[in-house]
Amino acid sequence: PQKAHIDLDFPIKVDQVILSGCYEDIGWFKKASVVEKTKLNQLLNDLELDHIRHRQIAELSGGQLQRVLVARALMSNSDIYCLDEPFVGIDIYSEQLIMKKIKHLRHMGKLILIVHHDLSKADQYFDRILLLNQSLQFLGPTKEALSSERLNATFINYKDDSLLTLSSQGSTN
């Protein structure tokens, strides 16, 4: 979730936020099992959050908070993960930790969908890219998606014929 939708004054600790990612499985008022606690500890370790596990979320830096939110999403045993701008406004160290975890999940056969607008590192991070501009413009290998021709066709020379059709139908001329 975007930070604007999070009440940072809510009195909740890092480990509690992360565990809330599996409440659908365990229920709101039940204690986490050994399995969930093991997964929590693994995520805390992988994303280097263990030393702040008992800290209130209001005390976290932007990168720490983003790592907590990614860990929360990863608490579920999903086959598909959708992450909305996980690298926005964070330090390079947090970005690298999150990307390392994402790559690990991908190697485990998980599908990771990421909304990402900064193309500068896309070739390092993603093996396939979907380009959108009003509609699907391209889906395929990163190298092809990032070609000058493809990017120009999608974002510079893009023409939405449906908008032209709509405006000509609404015209009184």
Label for each model-derived stretch:
Residues Q56-L60, Q64:
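Conserved ABC ATPase signature
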Residues Y81-D84:
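Catalytic Walker B motif of ABC-type/P-loop ATPase nucleotide-binding domains
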Residues I92-S94:
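Helix N-cap at the start of a conserved alpha-helix in ABC-type nucleotide-binding domains
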Residues H116-H117:
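H-loop/switch region of ABC-family ATPase nucleotide-binding domains
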Residues I129-T142:
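H-loop (His-switch) and adjacent beta-strand-loop-beta switch element
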Residues K143-N173:
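ABC ATPase nucleotide-binding domains
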